[in-house]
From Swiss-Prot:
Predominant subcellular localization, coarse grouping: mitochondrion
GO cellular component: mitochondrial inner membrane; proton-transporting ATP synthase complex
Entry similarity comment: Belongs to the ATPase A chain family.
SUPFAM superfamilies: F1F0 ATP synthase subunit A
Protein name: ATP synthase subunit a
Subunit note: Subunit of the F-type ATPase which has 2 components, CF(1) - the catalytic core - and CF(0) - the membrane proton channel.
Function: Mitochondrial membrane ATP synthase (F(1)F(0) ATP synthase or Complex V) produces ATP from ADP in the presence of a proton gradient across the membrane which is generated by electron transport complexes of the respiratory chain. F-type ATPases consist of two structural domains, F(1) - containing the extramembraneous catalytic core and F(0) - containing the membrane proton channel, linked together by a central stalk and a peripheral stalk. During catalysis, ATP synthesis in the catalytic domain of F(1) is coupled via a rotary mechanism of the central stalk subunits to proton translocation.
Localization annotation: Mitochondrion inner membrane
InterPro entries: ATP_synth_F0_asu, ATP_synth_F0_asu_AS, ATP_synth_F0_asu_bact/mt, F0_ATP_A_sf
Listed Pfam families: ATP-synt_A
TM stretches of this protein: 2-22, 53-73, 80-100, 168-188
Key words of the record: ATP synthesis, CF(0), Hydrogen ion transport, Ion transport, Membrane, Mitochondrion, Mitochondrion inner membrane, Transmembrane, Transmembrane helix, Transport
GO BP annotation list: proton motive force-driven ATP synthesis
Length: 199
């Protein structure tokens, strides 16, 4: 039974052709449908096309980090402050540099008809508001991922203690809850980046 037969290899290669090789392969079609559904979910506009690319990339990277960390080490890197802060700072910096390079930046910093004192005070408020965004993104993502992990594990442990450990569906339910938390938090983070880019 441990021998590999020619027909097994042939069937494996035959199926791989349909998955990867052809122009309209299953994997290519699946990726296209997934990206089109993301465009529908995020409700992108054509006014700032780069923002959709950045937020879809952010969404996919966060999902990959969450699922990769969870299924290999049972704790995702988005629950760690260091990873989340660096990722939020880079994402925020891309939005800030995009905003500074636009023509709206000078109008945003000094409104016509305002006095110098009001302009200075509003400038300080806007600077504090801009620089607090990566911290807010970091805290929001880290706390929500960690709390989601803890709540789903507490529910799993409570159900396991009350019903016993013979039910495999409890493990599946806990994993599905974790995956739902990952999906929602990745969506919220990338949606906030999209909104920051479209300001």
């Amino acid at each position: 039974m441990n021998q590999v037969y020619f027909l097994d290899i042939f069937m494996f290669v035959f199926v791989l052709q349909f998955l990867f090789y052809f122009k309209e392969s299953m994997l290519n079609t699946l990726v296209k449908k997934f990206l089109n559904s993301l465009v529908g979910v995020f409700s992108y506009t054509n006014t700032l096309p780069l923002s959709s690319v950045i937020s879809i990339f952010t969404f996919i990277v966060l999902l990959t980090c969450c699922f990769g960390g969870y299924f290999t080490y049972s704790f995702c890197p988005c629950g760690m402050v260091e990873f989340t802060f660096v990722y939020a700072a880079v994402a925020w910096l891309s939005t800030l540099l995009t905003f500074i390079s636009s023509e709206k930046f000078s109008v945003y910093m000094s409104k016509p008809g305002d006095t110098y004192l009001k302009t200075l005070s509003m400038l300080l408020i806007e600077i504090v508001s801009e620089f607090s965004r990566p911290l807010a993104l970091t805290v929001r993502l880290t706390v929500n991922i960690t709390v989601g992990h803890l709540v789903s594990m507490m529910l799993y442990q409570g159900l396991e203690l009350s019903m016993g450990d013979q039910y495999i569906w409890l493990s599946i339910l806990a994993i599905m809850m974790e995956c739902f938390v990952f999906f929602i938090q990745s969506y919220i983070f990338s949606r906030l980046i999209f909104l920051y880019l479209n300001e």
